Amino acid sequence: MGNSKEYLAELALYRNDPELARTIEEYALQGDKNAQYALGLIYAEGRGVQYNPVESYAWLTAAIMQGDQDAILLRSMIAEVLSSEAIEEAEERAAILMMHEDSFANQH
C-alpha cells in the first residue's frame, strides 16, 4: 500500500469526497503530519473541499513544522499563487492549527 501519506493523498484525490476530507481533517487536527500533508494537497486541488490555497499553505506549514520534508515542495508551489498578505494569513492559520494540536495532545 505504500506509506500512509501517499495512501491518504491518493484516496482523497481519487474520491473527491467531502466526508473523506472531514475524516482526514480530524486526523490532521490530532497532529498526524501525513494527514496534514494530505489535507494541504486536497485544498490545493479542491477535491472534496473548496479550492483554498491559503488553507492548503497553512496545513502544509503545519506538516513542515513537524518535519515533513515532502510538504516543502508543494508549499513552495502554492506560495507562487499567493500574495505576501495571503502567505502571512496562512502562517497565522498554521500557528493556530499547531496550538489546537498541542491542546489535543495534552488531553490524551
Regions from the language model: what does each represent?
Residues 12-22, 50-58, 85, 89:
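Structural signature of tandem alpha-helical TPR/SEL1-like repeats
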Residues 2-9, 38-45, 76-79:
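Hydrophobic face of amphipathic alpha-helices that form TPR/SEL1-like repeat modules
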Residues 20, 24, 65, 73-74, ...:
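Intrinsic-disorder/low-complexity detector
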Residues 40, 56-65, 71-78:
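Alpha-helical protein-protein interaction scaffolds
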Residues 25, 29, 54, 58-61, ...:
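Alpha-solenoid helical repeat scaffolds
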Residues 2-5, 15, 27, 77-108:
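Terminal, low-structured helical/coil segments at or just beyond the last alpha-helical repeat
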Residues 2-3, 16, 29-33, 45-47, ...:
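Short helix-capping/linker turns of helical repeat alpha-solenoids
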